[in-house]
Amino acid sequence: MLGHAAKLLARARFAIAFTGAGISAESGIPTFRGRNGLWKTYRAEELATPEAFKRDPHLVWEFYKWRMRKILKAEPNPAHKALAELENMGVLKAVITQNVDDLHREAGSRKVVELHGNIFRVRCVSCSYRENLKESGRVFEFVREKELPKCPKCGSLLRPDVVWFGEPLPREALEEAFSLAERADVVLVVGTSGVVYPAAYVPYIVKERGGKVIEVNVERSGITPIADVFIRGKAGEVMPELLRRVKDIMAERNHYG
């Protein structure tokens, strides 16, 4: 299975990756699903909604600042790094992710499409103000702040620039993801349940256009029925080995011209 996946990637004209919470769980970031999704006695799904923010913005921001602190302590794992290396080699053209943790960029991936936003970005609920807290150098000061964050432009509340339950995905990111999927001849799916739509359409678009689907996951998912190659295992263990095999194939090809 690994050998077949490596051949598909090494021969790909335009390969993309599609990642979900499973890849970041190995960096110690709790997923929204299962017992790990609990914070204080709340389920994440109860807090990650526009209604919850309207009702109690203090509570929602407390939850998101806790998540931000967790993510700031986390580091990209070998799977994130392997994907960045595959892009560096010219094998992967982009990483499309459902994660908001910014770990792909931390690992060195350059072309990252974030379908569900980025936890280190904030936006105003009233005007067009947006800020990337990492880029402005305010992230550590921001997570320590006890007051509700206000927009410096209009004074309204700031909210996390992420997609909450019941909200549509950002149109620009979704269009870019679908456009990449339409061009792709291989999609490498890593650590996603494949049940959150419309994001989960990405591998289906590749498949419908005659492309190949490689899946790396600890268990079967909503994507598995369309996968040409299914590799069961932890992404942090599988991906470095897959990278090594792709490198071997490409080195051999270069050697023999």
UniProtKB/Swiss-Prot annotation:
Residues that span the membrane, as ranges: none
Reactions it catalyzes: N(6)-acetyl-L-lysyl-[protein] + NAD(+) + H2O = 2''-O-acetyl-ADP-D-ribose + nicotinamide + L-lysyl-[protein]; N(6)-succinyl-L-lysyl-[protein] + NAD(+) + H2O = 2''-O-succinyl-ADP-D-ribose + nicotinamide + L-lysyl-[protein]
Binding site for substrate: 64, 67
Keywords in alphabetical order: Cytoplasm, Metal-binding, NAD, Transcription, Transcription regulation, Transferase, Zinc
Enzyme Commission identifier(s): 2.3.1.286
Active site (catalytic residues): 116
Localization terms from the record: Cytoplasm
Gene Ontology molecular function: histone deacetylase activity, NAD-dependent; NAD+ binding; protein-malonyllysine demalonylase activity; protein-succinyllysine desuccinylase activity; zinc ion binding
Entry binding sites for NAD(+): 20-39, 98-101, 191-193, 217-219, 235
Cofactor(s) needed: Zn(2+)
UniProt remark on cofactor binding: Binds 1 zinc ion per subunit.
Family annotation (Pfam families): SIR2
Domain Deacetylase sirtuin-type: residue ranges: 1-252
Gene3D superfamilies associated with the record: SIR2/SIRT2 'Small Domain, TPP-binding domain
One Gene Ontology CC term in the entry: cytoplasm
Xref: SUPFAM superfamilies: DHS-like NAD/FAD-binding domain
Residues engaged in binding Zn(2+): 124, 127, 151, 154
InterPro entries: DHS-like_NAD/FAD-binding_dom, NAD-dep_sirtuin_deacylases, Sirtuin, Sirtuin_cat_small_dom_sf, Sirtuin_class_III, Ssirtuin_cat_dom
Function comment: NAD-dependent lysine deacetylase and desuccinylase that specifically removes acetyl and succinyl groups on target proteins. Modulates the activities of several proteins which are inactive in their acylated form. Deacetylates the N-terminal lysine residue of Alba, the major archaeal chromatin protein and that, in turn, increases Alba's DNA binding affinity, thereby repressing transcription.
Family statement drawn from the similarity comment of this UniProt entry: Belongs to the sirtuin family. Class III subfamily.
Comment on protein domains: 2 residues (Tyr-64 and Arg-67) present in a large hydrophobic pocket are probably involved in substrate specificity. They are important for desuccinylation activity, but dispensable for deacetylation activity.
UniProt name for this protein: NAD-dependent protein deacylase
Gene: cobB
